[in-house]
Amino acid sequence: MTMLKNPSNKYRAFPAIDIPDRTWPSKAITQAPIWLSSDLRDGNQSLIEPMDAAKKMRFFKTLVQVGLKEIEVGFPSASQTDFDFVRELIEGGHIPDDVTIQVLTQAREDLITRTFESLKGAKQAIVHYYNATAPSFRRIVFNQDKAGVIQIAVNAGRIIKRLAEQNPETNWRFEYSPEIFSSTEPEFAVEVCNAVIEVFQPTPEQKLILNLPATVEAATPNVYADQIEWFCRHIDRRDSVLVSLHTHNDRGTGVAATELGLMAGADRVEGCLFGNGERTGNVDLVTVALNMYTQGVDPQLDFSDIDAVRKVVEECNQLPVHPRHPYVGDLVHTAFSGSHQDAIRKGFSQQDPNGLWEVPYLPIDPADIGRSYEAVIRVNSQSGKGGITFLLEQEYGISLPRRMQIEFSQVVQKETDRLGLEMSAKQIYALLEAEYLQATAPYTLKGHRLQEENGTSAVDVEVAADGEVIHWRGIGKGPLEALVAALPVKLEIMDYHEHAIGAGSNAKAAAYIEVRLDGERPLHGIGIDENITTASIRALFSAMNRALHQAQEAAA
């Protein structure tokens, strides 16, 4: 079978909701929602190999450490493993006083009863129940009419309320999900939820959670936002319910749907870290939270060490996080492109540590989430001088002058083309050493002595060449002019730069010099030494030897 030429014969667009006065497009997210992690339930049930008790406990503690205050810990009526885990959390005293666990149950009395058994002794808990409301599920799966669906929700609600009243030692909260909400007629979704509201009689002090799942993502995010706004306008006792979002990523827009849903009036978000979950996954709580953070909104979740969180999630889920995954992937803060690298390097050089973040191509400061700057710029055959310069500055304190950046980038480009691989900062520095710092032929500096008197410098240098030691002497207005006068070749200094590497007693000096030999094209040299004069002399020898070597190659 192949793709259809006319897919409308098989698929139809989801109907839009008519809200001519919709308000969500002009809204902004200005505060964090209530967050619930479903990693231990929705995430866990989607794994090839579900977590054992030890992994679940490790994951739970990580969620608490991140700052999650509501955590769905399992489906205890459907799994003995989940039941035992809930008991261990409660009996082992693992639940902090400010954290509420949530469990899921189907709308059946035996399963609800088993659920309450699992929660015995909990200080506080949310009982979350659901039944499917979408037309296709009513017709195909359950053969139920609308009245039958409402009756299921109401009957289950009454059982839950009764069992809660029989166990007053726990501070109970309740959540209802019209499953497949995003494919349910809006009027019917409100009708079912209003019937549930009548059962629980919520108040502004004791709110009922109405969770509105895009169980299967069926439309563009703006349609989901319209559904949420319409629901918020028409539901009874809006001040006594928390409207919760539970999006999936079947169309790849779970994050966008969640953000627009919050703009449309929702109060709460359910999801999983890094988007684990059924099929294409639940919404990624990390991405939603850090999207808020980069807009200046405190998400009230702490991802200061995002790689440690990722390590736990990968090991417990036995699934890798994609290298391009927002914020946490190995490559998301990495630039290979030369123009991108140049912009990033300039951004870092001008960034005010206490000012607004304005580094191009980086929507977040990697340091805020525990990332180093080492991986921000990586060099391959697509890279330019900006990336090379950045790595040398960050890792070795080497600040190449602009024209030298261009010259050395050609050296690196030639090497990356030869290797066909990425080059690390260490490899780039080794190339710099080989090209400039080890340019000791045909003349190797063995030593020098400088005398200065009345504004005149006299320099004596000891040089090794062709197995012999020779001496040069020159006089000039400064050490470099004196050295140029001593050289056996006609050398013209075009440019000179110097700076310190490091600080304090261990600091070294770096000198960069650009010379022209016999009127040929300019070339550069580098010298590094504890003494700035020695560094300058080494730089001149480096440039001279490189120029002589290239002249010899050209003649050959």
Swiss-Prot record:
Substrates-to-products reaction catalysed: 3-methyl-2-oxobutanoate + acetyl-CoA + H2O = (2S)-2-isopropylmalate + CoA + H(+)
Residues involved in Mg(2+) binding: 42, 246, 248, 282
Enzyme class of the recorded protein, top EC level: transferase
Record pathway: Amino-acid biosynthesis; L-leucine biosynthesis; L-leucine from 3-methyl-2-oxobutanoate: step 1/4
Family from the record: Belongs to the alpha-IPM synthase/homocitrate synthase family. LeuA type 2 subfamily.
Role of this protein: Catalyzes the condensation of the acetyl group of acetyl-CoA with 3-methyl-2-oxobutanoate (2-ketoisovalerate) to form 3-carboxy-3-hydroxy-4-methylpentanoate (2-isopropylmalate).
Name the UniProt record assigns to this protein: 2-isopropylmalate synthase
Organism: Stutzerimonas stutzeri (strain A1501) (Pseudomonas stutzeri)
